[in-house]
Amino acid sequence: MTRTNLPRMAVGTLVAGALLSTAACGLSGGSGDVKEAEKTGRVAGEITFRTLQLKPAFTAYVQGVIDAFEKKYPDAKVKWEDVPGDGYNEKLVADAQAGALPDVVNLSTDSFQLLGDRGMLADVATLDGESAKEYVPGAWEQFKLPGKGDGVYAYPWYVTPEILTYNKELFAKAGLDPAKPPTSVEQFFDYAEQIAARSGGQYSAFMADPKGRLPGDWQKMGIPILNEKQDRFTFDTDQAVAWVERMKDLYAKGAMPKESLLKSDDINQLYGGGKIVFGPGSPGFVKDIKQNAPQVYANTQVAGAVTGKLGHIGIYAQSLGIKKDTKHLDAAAEFAKWVTSGPNQVEFSKKATIYPSNAQGLADPRFADRGDGRDAETVARAIGAEQLKTAALDANTPVQWTNQVGDAVVREMQKAIKGEQDARTAVKKAQEEANKLLANAVKK
């Protein structure tokens, strides 16, 4: 039910919003500061390709993709560099300041925003007018930038959808039908209350984890996170207050592990030990449970994510950006398209729990196969793929909801859930603090 975590190899890209804001001050102020490269019609020259923490697990795969590209385009050479997750955005900032960005660079959501907002990335939509139809619409749209029209500033790479994972044995013990999982936030809470009432304190329903639940739960409830101009937070509503009050009530009734209000890093252990009903909403988690807790895996069931009033999930894609002033634009663009092509993304998905952003790749029979319907990992792969076909950006965390904003909101929610302040005060204070942070970010 909580937002899907990025694959482990990408987790290191997520750094504090404050760090991004501060570091970005040293970058060029706009696209006019960087000269736009032009295509020559010849795929040639040496380009640099930077990935994030793919060695050594995926060395053979990536090198194979590079070798095949160089065989097709013998005048082009790809210099591959793989860097650790720690300090990834700081390195991007330093390279941008020094004019040393790679020609093709792996970007997460925040690092894309960091470089894109400052005009450091090429508009890939103008490089090939046919590119848009090659990718899942939700993924392609994700890499547009506010105020820049139909420009798209990175090729979508791999994605990870949100699903619902639960222990069907504990589900049934609580008097719930495993074939009827919750579809709305309100229903999810109703189920959690029943689980708490029937468990006798032997297991919990879900992790409190307000950092992971917000703003997703509110979006699914139809709560407006921002105003129409996208410059003010507007979540201070009766619905948000009701969410806090329900969380407080469920917390008091034992629907969540007490320690999960402050941390959620032990969920694998709790779920694997049969101590919690709902696991993380990630296909990768299902694979981990299969490997590490086979007895619980046998009782694991998966379903479509709780989507509430939205009716669809969001989409979070890794991407490949192209340096705006690359000296070899043809080679860089062709290589980025090569890496993100259907066949190459499908092959990658066989080695990691990821999904193609490429429409052809997502249409591969592998992603429709549910087997006999008994293996949770196989079913999870099919459900995730099906949901990606209708994924849309209005279910994504807004870029304005930085880590700083999230932390500020969560602090107030934690106080209210523990009973240290009332729900209405918590939501009001959270919105006020969030708007202060947003205003300060705009000034910078």
Q: Which residues does each predicted region cover?
A:
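Short, low-complexity disordered leader/linker segments with a strong preference
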Residues: M1-T48, K71, T425, N435-K444
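Helix-loop-helix "hinge/cap" segment bordering the ligand-binding cleft or interdomain interface
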Residues: K71, D75, P146-G212, L226-L261, ...
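Short, well-ordered beta-strand elements
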Residues: G41-P56, A76-E81, D103-V104, Y153, ...
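Hinge/lid segment of periplasmic solute-binding proteins
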Residues: T109-P161, D217-W218, Q301
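Extracytoplasmic/periplasmic substrate-recognition and gating elements
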Residues: D67, A174, E245, A252-M256, ...
